[in-house]
Each structure stands twice: as C-alpha cells, then as structure tokens.
Amino acid sequence: TLNSGSAVNVIPELTELEGEVRSFNLKKAEDNFNLLANIFKCEAEKIGAKIEIDYFWDFVPYTIPESSFVFKETVRAIKKVGLEPTPKISLGGSDANSLNGRGIESINLGIGAQNPHSNDEFIYIEDLIKSAEIALELVKKD
C-alpha cells in the first residue's frame, strides 16, 4: 500500500509504503527484506531523503516433519474418518504460524472451504461435518 501526498503534481512531505515479504524459509524472507530495505536506503540517500524502516514478522514460516508426532496424529485422525490426507504447503498465514513461532508444534488443517477469501466463499455441509469429525478424532483419547 502506498500513501503519498494530498494533491496532484505536488511533492509530498511524507510517503508511506507498506508491504510484505513471504517465503517458506525464514532466512530467505529475512534476506529478501534486507535487500529491499537496502535498496530503499540507497535510493533515499541519493536524493537526500530521510527514511525510516519499521517491520515485524506477522507470520513466521514453518515446516512440520512427517516424522513428528503432530503430523502422524493428524494423518491418523484424517484416515480414521475415511479421508486420505493430502499435505500442501501454503504462503498464507494462520494461527499455526503464530503457534509454531512460539515453539508449539501445530498444523493448519483445511476445512474444505471453496473459493476462500472471496465474496463467493462457501463450504459444503458434508465438508464441515468431516472437519468436525477430524477435530473430534484429534482430541479423543484412545
């Protein structure tokens, strides 16, 4: 998002740029952020502009190994309700990013939403029921 100035054909006193850097790998994300920050600093210096850079990690990337307890239990629960797990990677963010970033191993489970993040998003009742069944399997004690 770029916010700059209040009139056409006028040099603004302040320009604000907001964006995000995403990667499956935290080191790559940090490297890409630092590259962008250095480009902005160099360009600001060339024209004598002042620059301030603030950042925070909203979603830290994570990978859960297939050998982990959490992964195996999730696969077990999905199979127990008659489905075949199809692990996917995503650049999207979820609570799982925050939990993993705090050392609590977790997996983001899709619930079968169709057309996610759109005005046409919906879920089939059968998929919602299956999601609840998976959740129940994950919390049950055998």
Stretches with model-predicted labels:
Residues 1-45, 49-60:
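Midchain, well-structured core segments that form catalytic/ion-binding scaffolds
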Residues 28-31, 66-69, 123-127:
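Alpha-helix N-cap and loop-to-helix initiation/capping positions
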Residues 44-45, 79, 100:
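Alpha-helical segments within the soluble intracellular
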Residues 50-56, 82-89:
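C-terminal helix-coil-helix/basic helical segment that borders enzyme active sites and/or dimer interfaces
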Residues 83-134:
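Zn-dependent metallopeptidase/amidohydrolase metal-coordination segment
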Residues 134-142:
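C-terminal alpha-helix
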